[in-house]
Amino acid sequence: MLPIVPLPQKQKRKNSKTNIASLNQPFILSQTEIDKSKSSIFKINIAVKNTSNNNTNKINNKKVSKKNEKTEIKNNNNNNLTFIENAIINFEKGFYNQSLQQALKSIEIEDSEEKANYIAFLCYLEMYDIDSAEKFLCNNNNNKKLKNLLENKKLQILLNSNKYKSYPKYINFLQNLHKNNSYFPKLEIHFYTDDYRGVLAKNKILKDEIIMAIPKQCLITLEVALNTNYGKKISEFMHQELNSPKHCLLSSFLLFEENNPIYKYYFDLLPNDYSNFPIFYTKKEFDYLKNSPFLNLIMNKKLDMQMDYNKLCEKIENFKNFTFEKFCKARLIISSRIFGISINNNKTDALVPFADLLNHRRPRQTQWFFDDDKNAFIVQAVEDINIGQEIFDSYGKKTNYRFLLNYGFTLENNDMGEYPLTINFNNEYPLYNMKKNFFKNKYDFIRTFNLNSNFQESQILELISYLRFLLYEENINNLFKKILSNRKTLNEEIAINYYFFYPINIEMEIKVLSHLKYLCEKELEKYPTTILQDQKLYKENKNKKDFNFNYRNCLLLLISEKSVLIYYIQFCDYCLQLLKSKKITEVIDKVAKDYKENNFKYNFYIKEVILKLVYEKEKEEIENDKKNYEKKQKTKEDKDMDEEDDI
């Protein structure tokens, strides 16, 4: 699992129990918070006493004007606290940049300089500004505790970055976020390996607590990209001529602004290796997916990117300076990282530094939204998170197809499966010459249906309806009359273009399900390995350090594909068995028993199709039995009358 990527939709905002300051204004405390802050101020007083040099002497010859100034000047707040008191409180709250400014002001007016130096020193450490922290250490040259704090922070940074060359980019990234008044006091970036990182909790986090706030000025939104010369040019044709207009716009921004000092701190931290994304697979890695329909998705995605790239080269000056490979990487950054948000009721997409470092996990630990009042992107905990625990986002409920194609990883226990089943309408189907006239063009002769392990009602109904059309052997016009008779409840376009054919009879439905089972079995036969062989391979290798990451992803994808096909084969077998029931009570009894044991997901098909067909069949047989009985009775009566006449 690789880091970074957002939820596909905006999360529902909840009321926060944690109050944080406006990110563009000084932190104003309530009277309750002021009272609570006394303990924090006391702790800082003790810390300063314990860490101060015993030989340090106070300057006794301060000017009277300075002395008066320090007692009269407050922090432009209504809480009647001095600069140093506000600095301490803001430090405790995690607003290090604001705390630093107040500490520096306190030093400037020579008020509580020892405390102010100590607070400033700690602020620089928290903001990873080691050089400035060392300067403040010089003011306390004999202070061993401060030296130890500094060395520990340096060591923490080096250990956390895992390799020295990552250190400058990592530090610069955090420094810039702090300078822009970003808020994440309880979070730290952790590197598990050279290429895999996550976000950990430095302190205990409570449910509903705001754990991150990234100001709007740090976000790269569609509006930011549109405000450039090339962005304005792209906007003239993006929706008409590009396959992925928004992604292309933001990708262009990444390419053109690569060396822009405003964003360089963020761009420098973006990954350079994209070999885990399928569009960059080697021939050997493509062979892992032999006969998988996923190969077609990769080709189509790359083709769409190529078309967009060609169009941008044609329309945008100097775009040819960027290679197609570089454009693809920029597109992958966007597709795997953007957040869909709403700012002042305007929907937009945005890159959000730091927030995009959260890895994926379901169920979610956090929710995110843009807060118009705070003018910032907010991440909020939806459960308690312990110290040292990794903090996750949820990228949404997606299949491994979507995860691998757009994010470069798969999930081992993903209950969402997908298989694109392609059906080629040809002369092997009955009444081919008559039926082909109903297709708009030759492309309609080949249709693909996404089989889903969640068994979505609309998808399976569309597939089975289409098969009813293909397998129908009587006068096709009668079938369309049946469709058109339902137009009161059925959109005409859906009826004609999507072949929404209602169940005809049990015999026809048996044909349809038998054919669907046959199609799924044929797809399974294409693979060089069985699902049992794939599962065995994965189980034997998943804990090995040298288990190739891309091979792992391909194995999990193949297992997922085959699982879906097997699931639909089992569905067909089960429903065929039900359709052979003679009485509706037999169906109800069996389904009630099996539902408790299996809790299968295709209840709606049983209810809407099978029960109705079996009921109609049973009713028809009862009517036939009644007619036969009446016929026999009449025959008997006629015979009796004939005998009476003979007598």
What is the meaning of each model-derived region?
Residues 162-218, 223-226, 257-632, 638-647:
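Long, positively charged leader/targeting segments at protein N-termini
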